[in-house]
Amino acid sequence: MITASNAEVGEVWWRLAYRRVRNIKLPWIPVFIMLLLLVCAGFSPLVAPHDPTAINILDSKLAPGENLNYPLGTDILGRDMLSRLIYGARTTVFISLVALGTGALAGTVIGLVAGFREGWFDAITMRAADAALGFPTILVAMVIVVIMGAGIESIILAVLLTVWARFARMIRGDVLSIKDMDYITAAKIAGVSMPMIIWRHIFPNTVNTLMIITSLQVGQVILLEASLSFLGLGLPVGEPAWGIMVSEGKAVILDVWWLSLFPGVAITVVVLAFNYFGDWMRDALDPKLRRL
């Protein structure tokens, strides 16, 4: 964690972080994979060669390379595999951004307030965080989706309720380590309000931890969404989502092997890229956080 003096707080933390990062070699392969994912997600209609939901029985089960119009082949309904993979990236990025962003916001606010105020709020929220972290993530997500029903809203809520606790725990730890510093005490004596102290003096010193946790959690969120979709607890069947595509191909994997292979490879490569980038962020910004 990078801490700053009273005069530096709020304006220097990002410069210190930048100086640390710029001297470390950027992992270009993971970065390229992440950029490719974002391009596919943001420009799916322009990048995809076909409509991912268009059915063409005459071109069903085309193997990769058998027809140049379908370089990755087609599924049992004649839908283009490449287009479905590209549109699947949009689904993955949308769910990850919304769910992880909401979970990070909730966890950060809870961690900041709990660490600064302590007392009953700290006790209640941290016991709730312990409970959330004590259960397997996939089990909690499955219970939520079963109760609410399959759909994108259920997946987002499931991810939110499984990631907020880690953010809250780590941010609270940062707050406890700096809340008694001289410049914080001086701000309290001067009558500065709690929200202003948190925003101007404490939050800037937690940004590094927030960035590291977020980068490390993206891969887990993608894997969780794919797992729920594979189990039939995610998006509706037929949607171009990677987990659903793997599930649709499992029954014919010996005959039409590419149905499960390509989305499975996409999930694996993207998750590994984000995990590697998260490790790089952790080592670059704060090697002490290697326990994450």
Please describe what each predicted stretch is.
Residues 1-108, 112-113, 120, 138, ...:
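Gly/Trp-centered helix-boundary motif
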Residues 170, 205, 209, 213, ...:
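Conserved polar catalytic motif of the HATPase_c/GHKL fold
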Residues 20-21, 85-88, 92, 113, ...:
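Amphipathic alpha-helical segments that mediate coupling or scaffolding at interfaces
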Residues 30-31, 139, 155-159, 185, ...:
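Hydrophobic/aromatic positions within or immediately flanking transmembrane alpha-helices
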Residues 90, 101, 132, 136, ...:
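Residue-level hotspots within pore-lining transmembrane alpha-helices
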